[in-house]
Structures are given as structure tokens and as C-alpha cells.
Amino acid sequence: MRRGTSEYEAAQEAMAEILLERARSGDWPIQYGKLSNLLEEQGHNVPAHSVEMDHLLADVSHQESPDGTKTTLSVMVVLKEKGEPGAGFYRLAREEFGRKGDNVGIWGEEMKLLAGDFRHR
């Protein structure tokens, strides 16, 4: 699956719908494996720990917050073993969304933004 293809765009739309619904309902966090399974149920093969998963999470985050003022939706997706986001989330938050601080601080602030952005929806 490559960026810019109809297959990729369909997977991105499906991921956005899954994450937005979970954000609105407060049903987060979600593990990478669970997100992968939900996408698979809709016909999208996106392995949990793959480049495609990283790219889709980044693109969905940019889609929902193009100017970086809202939360990165990828904050809800966590590693089963640690219960926190993977390295790709922190890289995205720092390099593309301009977030500052250590991992714990960035994660905490993004979770607050998530709660604030979706509290009244």
C-alpha cells in the first residue's frame, strides 16, 4: 500500500472514521493490534507495527489538525506492552506538530487536548 493510491486513501478514511468515533465516545486508548484488526474487518491490510500504520496515523493526524492546534489523533493508539504510544507518535508530535518536552509531558498534553477537543461532540 502506497501513499497517493486509492487503496491508501480508503484505508486512511477508514482509520479516520475509527479513531474519530472512538475519540467522540471516549473509547480510548486503542492498541495498535486492535486498530489493525478493525481495519482488516473493513478490507484494509495494515499490519500493527508497519510503515503503513505509521504513515496512516501521521496522515490522519494531519487531516484532522492541519495547523497543529488540535490533538494528534494518533495519541490514542498505544503499544500493548507499554500502554503508551510508540516512537512514531513522539517523532510526529515533535517534528511535525512542534510539541516540546519529554515523552511523558508530550503524551499528557496530547491526552488533555484529546479530551478537550472531543468533550462536547
Predicted feature locations:
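Nucleic acid-binding interface residues in structured DNA/RNA-binding domains
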Residues: 1-15, 22-121
